[in-house]
Amino acid sequence: MHGESPIKRRESRKIWVGSVPVGGDAPIAVQSMTNSDTNDVAATVAQINRLEAAGVDIVRVSVPDMDAAEAFGRIKQLVKVPLVADIHFDHRIALRVAELGVDCLRINPGNIGREDRVRAVVDAARDRGIPIRIGVNAGSLEKDLQKKYGEPTPEALVESALRHVEHLQRLNFQDFKVSVKASDVFMAVAAYRLLAKEIVQPLHLGITEAGGLRSGTVKSAVGLGMLLAEGIGDTIRISLAADPVEEVKVGYDILKSLRLRSRGINFIACPSCSRQNFDVVKTMNELEGRLEDLLVPLDVAVIGCVVNGPGEAKEAHIGLTGGTPNLIYIDGKPAQKLTNDNLVNELERLIREKAAEKAEADASVIVRG
């Protein structure tokens, strides 16, 4: 039952991606991206619905050509979550998805083409209240910056970003967010730190091409954790070569660990040892699978023995500490003794009861407020 996060977030301009606020005092938004063929409308809608069920706030969809733009329009009509269209090179695609109701455009003004084309995209965005995301990536820096710096560097990433920022600002457009991504953690962190001092717009955080589920999770947690702990970042995307739903889960787990945002169960569990009185690993696996549907923020401690068990259990909404018999704590107080028989079923029941109680209490506070 930990309190608010001690992190003081960087002040930034608030923009709106559909119904989702980004920046300012808004919660840090969790994003993901579809990896289906955009032209396969049914598959893409199904994936977006799965992402929404997992708690995603914003979904990015690649729109490589005009056929995909038309498919994007059909997808937009079939989902509720705000959609970002990822567009490169052809400004006409951006203009078309703007007509079709896109919630945000992800572009680089530098690869859209001539000034008149950039102006046309910006005018369309302004007229429809559509924000733009400037996305700079170490793998696709401008040739002159590659020549100037010799290789991708934090300074090169920021110089590229500021070029695009100035481009939009010359056109009197301020509703944008910026990312400066790299697959190298130190490069990305340094670039975001530099950029955070230069602009007031919200920052979209990510470690690009982070890797598979395990390695990508670790790299993203390290890199984004460093920045978020410093108050930098308004929206995050965990880039994984895995099911996009896993990106959402990892994103929320990172935010939970820093007490920046809560959704669902925050498990505190020991790695287990020979002192355990029940199978901690098996118990955790079963509970995580069974309780994925719960959205109410709860701290649940699952500790296998009495060394650290009582201390952790007392700090959680519900805690289980191993013993003979095992002991359940509710709101920091011993409440019930349990044997290993039916342990998971009983613990699930208690957690669901506590979640319902907390949801009702939270709703009551909102109504009274």
Curated annotation (Swiss-Prot):
* SUPFAM superfamilies in the record: Inosine monophosphate dehydrogenase (IMPDH), Nitrite and sulphite reductase 4Fe-4S domain-like
InterPro entries found in the cross-reference section: Dihydropteroate_synth-like_sf (IPR011005), IspG_bac (IPR016425), IspG_bac-typ (IPR004588), NO2/SO3_Rdtase_4Fe4S_sf (IPR045854)
What cofactor is this protein dependent on? [4Fe-4S] cluster
- Which key words tag this protein in UniProt? 4Fe-4S, Iron, Iron-sulfur, Isoprene biosynthesis, Metal-binding, Oxidoreductase
User: Cross-referenced Pfam families, in alphabetical order?
Assistant: GcpE
Q: Which residues bind [4Fe-4S] cluster?
A: C270, C273, C305, E312
Q: Which reaction does it catalyse?
A: (2E)-4-hydroxy-3-methylbut-2-enyl diphosphate + oxidized [flavodoxin] + H2O + 2 H(+) = 2-C-methyl-D-erythritol 2,4-cyclic diphosphate + reduced [flavodoxin]
Instruction: Give the UniProt record's GO annotations in the biological process aspect.
Output: isopentenyl diphosphate biosynthetic process, methylerythritol 4-phosphate pathway; terpenoid biosynthetic process
Q: Name one GO molecular function term.
A: 4-hydroxy-3-methylbut-2-enyl-diphosphate synthase activity (flavodoxin)
Q: What class of enzyme is it?
A: oxidoreductase
> In the record's cofactor note, how is the cofactor described as bound?
Binds 1 [4Fe-4S] cluster.
Q: In which pathway does it act?
A: Isoprenoid biosynthesis; isopentenyl diphosphate biosynthesis via DXP pathway; isopentenyl diphosphate from 1-deoxy-D-xylulose 5-phosphate: step 5/6
Protein origin, superkingdom: Bacteria
In short, the EC number is 1.17.7.3
Please report which protein family the annotation says this sequence is part of: Belongs to the IspG family.
Q: What does this protein do?
A: Converts 2C-methyl-D-erythritol 2,4-cyclodiphosphate (ME-2,4cPP) into 1-hydroxy-2-methyl-2-(E)-butenyl 4-diphosphate.
Q: Which PANTHER family does the record cross-reference, listed alphabetically? A: 4-HYDROXY-3-METHYLBUT-2-EN-1-YL DIPHOSPHATE SYNTHASE (PTHR30454), 4-HYDROXY-3-METHYLBUT-2-EN-1-YL DIPHOSPHATE SYNTHASE (FERREDOXIN), CHLOROPLASTIC (PTHR30454:SF0)
For this entry, the protein name equals 4-hydroxy-3-methylbut-2-en-1-yl diphosphate synthase (flavodoxin)
Q: Which organism is it from?
A: Pseudomonas syringae pv. syringae (strain B728a)
